[in-house]
């Protein structure tokens, strides 16, 4: 079929009713090329071919800078300017199109991504030529995928069919701005300087500081009438280190600093203090005893609570849609624990959860989860997800789910099969009944005394986003699944303390959650007055793994500390290599 669908035929194929075009900025050749190609496609018709009903153009004019350093020396430096386009074509109709089936693959059988073909110099002719060819390839792919889907449907009884694509209102916004260059030389110096901190800690085996800076001018246009241009910028500096305890157990810690939309990242002195804190945490963990399997009251302090609740709620507040596979074919598929629970209590009645990507600042904190449109071209709106402990809504992309009429504008990561995955932006977890954190600690002590338990558990930090490698994470997750206990694998606690009846704290290592699920959230007994803001970059990697490639979704979570009536923790069971026999070399310690 592909060989019969020429680029000329494609140009004659696209025909769909459109709203009146909005005026363009006079000097923007990218938007002009997008408009002219879309107008040309709109006016021409060809019989005998599936008709596109939706066409989408995206372009990221992006400068990126990636720097890695360890012990004062640069490991990697990469600075590049790219123009990354994406073209999507959907054929059929909103009710039935080429997406949402197994044969559609990751892009949905109608997405063309041609990074290497776009010129860096502005040329209207070159832009239009590339749009035309990319659209042709996307159209061919969409027609083929749609044909396969219709064959699958002939053999499959779909009991409760859903549309394939939500309709959306057009959104037009042109934000003044330009691509801001990244000062790579300055960042090389700063990154290397922070990495020298770890030379003073011989017990640390591996360490690194990684800088990722992005500056972009984003363009979006679709056949429904949406058109946007806006500048974007995100800089993250990751500090991470790892070592082994005398028994061979791997220990990790990390810190993440993020600046958003041109806001300044932390000063060098603060970054150095952050690296020193990571090193001191590991130094203490090396000397700490191994924790014991535990079931009982657990106090999670505000920062760790934002990590824990951000992960557990963020993974379940959306409903993934299983792609059509056909008779006899199975699809590995992780459903949401909140599916079917609208109207049910999922939290204590004094807790509310709202996601609001429209906010840019709260209590003096810059909210990095703010964005203008999602990957579907939809303007986000605030969503009251949980009210008085009762689940009210899910986050949604333009892939329809049962019982809801539209997108909430949260489709920010690719989910495969032509859909975008809804993820949180700025997640606010608010408690109406609170106590001082010190009072929560006293309540924890009272609970363990009443139960004649020798100690309780306090958690100050999780390894989330995970600082482990992909191979290490796969081993960790496999071990968690094999240990039983139900629930889904959860990020590892990084700083865990035993709390004794006299208030004394003892750091322990080697514990992980067991049997954690959204059902655990109903065991929250109290929350703290104090709250924390947790900023991170979400991605498609497990536990938002640091440095994972692909689409990124900057995210802020605000949460109080929480006291659980009961949680389970168990000893980690991953196999580890023996600690080094030869002592580490003597390193020259230079002042950062």
Place the predicted regions along the sequence by residue.
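Short, flexible, solvent-exposed loop/turn segments with mixed acidic/basic and small polar residues
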Residues: 4, 169-170, 415-419
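Hydrophobic helical h-region of N-terminal Sec-dependent signal peptides
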Residues: 6-16
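Active-site bordering "gate/hinge" segments
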Residues: 16-382, 387-390, 403, 514-526, ...
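Long, low-charge, small-residue-enriched segments that form tightly packed helices used
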Residues: 135, 358, 376-592
């Amino acid at each position: 079929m592909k060989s019969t669908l020429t680029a000329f035929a494609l140009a004659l194929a696209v025909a769909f009713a459109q709203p009146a075009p909005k005026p363009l900025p006079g000097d923007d050749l990218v938007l002009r090329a997008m408009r002219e190609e879309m107008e040309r496609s709109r006016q021409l018709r060809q019989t005998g071919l599936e008709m596109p009903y939706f066409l989408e153009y995206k372009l990221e004019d992006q400068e990126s800078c990636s720097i890695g350093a360890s012990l004062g020396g640069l490991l990697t430096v990469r600075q590049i300017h790219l123009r990354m386009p994406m073209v999507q074509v959907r054929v059929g109709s909103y009710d039935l199109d080429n997406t949402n089936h197994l044969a559609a693959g990751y892009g949905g059988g109608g997405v063309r991504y041609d990074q290497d073909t776009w010129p860096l110099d502005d040329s209207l002719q070159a832009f239009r030529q590339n749009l035309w060819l990319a659209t042709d390839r996307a159209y061919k792919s969409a027609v083929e995928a749609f044909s396969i889907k219709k064959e699958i449907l002939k053999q499959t009884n779909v009991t409760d069919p859903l549309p394939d694509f939500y309709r959306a209102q057009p959104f037009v916004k042109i934000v003044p701005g330009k691509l801001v260059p990244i000062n790579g030389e300055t960042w090389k110096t700063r990154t290397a300087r922070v990495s020298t901190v770890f030379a003073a800690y011989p017990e640390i085996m591996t360490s690194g500081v990684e800088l990722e800076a992005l500056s972009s001018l984003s363009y979006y246009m679709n056949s429904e009438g949406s058109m946007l241009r806006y500048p974007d910028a995100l800089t993250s500096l990751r500090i991470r280190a790892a070592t082994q305890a005398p028994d061979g157990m791997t220990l990790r810690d990390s810190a993440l600093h993020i600046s958003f939309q041109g806001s300044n990242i932390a000063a060098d002195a603060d970054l150095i203090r952050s690296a020193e804190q990571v090193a001191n945490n590991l130094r203490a963990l090396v000397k700490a005893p191994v924790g014991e399997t535990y079931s009982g009251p657990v106090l999670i302090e505000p920062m760790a609570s934002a990590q824990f609740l951000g992960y557990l709620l963020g993974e379940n507040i959306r409903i993934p849609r299983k792609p059509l596979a056909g008779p006899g074919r199975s699809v590995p598929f992780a459903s949401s624990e909140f599916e079917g629970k609208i109207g049910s209590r999922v939290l204590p009645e004094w807790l509310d959860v709202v996601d609001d990507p429209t906010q840019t600042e709260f209590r003096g904190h810059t909210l990095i989860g703010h964005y203008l449109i999602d990957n579907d071209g939809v303007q986000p709106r605030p969503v009251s997800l949980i009210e008085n402990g009762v689940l009210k809504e899910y986050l949604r992309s333009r892939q329809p789910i049962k019982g809801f009429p539209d997108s909430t504008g949260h489709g920010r990561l690719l989910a495969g099969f032509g859909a975008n995955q809804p993820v949180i932006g700025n997640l606010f977890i608010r408690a109406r009944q609170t106590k001082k954190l010190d009072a929560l600690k006293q309540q924890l002590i009272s609970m363990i005394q009443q139960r004649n338990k020798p100690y309780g558990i306090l958690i100050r930090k999780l390894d989330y986003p995970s600082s482990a490698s992909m191979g290490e994470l796969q081993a960790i997750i496999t071990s968690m699944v094999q240990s039983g206990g139900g629930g889904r694998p959860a990020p590892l606690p990084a700083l865990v303390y035993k709390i004794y009846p006299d208030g004394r704290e003892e750091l322990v290592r080697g514990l992980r959650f067991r049997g954690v699920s959204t059902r655990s959230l109903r065991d929250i007994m109290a929350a703290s007055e104090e709250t924390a803001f947790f900023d991170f970059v979400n991605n498609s990697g497990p536990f938002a793994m640091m440095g994972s490639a692909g689409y990124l979704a900057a995210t802020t979570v605000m949460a109080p500390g929480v006291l659980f009536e009961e949680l389970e923790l168990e000893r980690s069971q991953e196999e580890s290599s023996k600690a080094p026999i030869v002592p580490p070399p003597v390193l020259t310690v230079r002042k950062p």
